[in-house]
Amino acid sequence: IARRYATERWIGGYDLLNEPVLFNGGSQVRNLQRRMRNRIRKYDLNHTLFVNGNMWSRAFEGMGPALDQNMIWAFHYYSWMVFNRVNQSTIQYLINFRNLTNRPLWLGEAGENSNEWFMEVTNLMEKNDIGWAWWNYKKIGTITGPVSSPSDSVYQQITKYWNGDGARPTTEIAQLGLNNMVENLKLEHCE
């Protein structure tokens, strides 16, 4: 990937490993991500590396020092991770880590609760000079994102089956439902 995209200006960077979970600590995650960095840097010195913490991108013990001068510590912030509280104490350890390693922070995912919750999270991030992105930008039939695509009854048959609440759809129904979902995800059909 790095060899192919090294000179592409429209590439923002590489998210090395999304939500790693190694119960023996961050040093194992760090070692794996260091090997990934070394491979990428053989071909690409231009693009930023997004380095996620351990335990679903929340724990940074054993992750320092910084792996690269052109890197950002990436973390996730979901309500279950912070007991549905949005306040300074839930991110202070990240700010301390940022200051210790002299590398910026990036909130790569924040969980779908409510628009009010999102507002509190983005305000907290901006108050602390932390970059952030919507996760997820586009969802099916919800208000917890900037863009919502419509759902339809055929696609809902599939999701009911996946959730154990409905009969297994035929191959034809499954294909039609997934095709409908893809069509509905086009921006011209979204709210």
For each of these PLM feature ranges, what is it?
Residues 3-130, 134, 144-156:
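Extracellular glycoside hydrolase catalytic/binding regions
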Residues 123-124, 128-191:
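Extended, alpha-helix-rich binding/interface surfaces that flank or overlap catalytic cores
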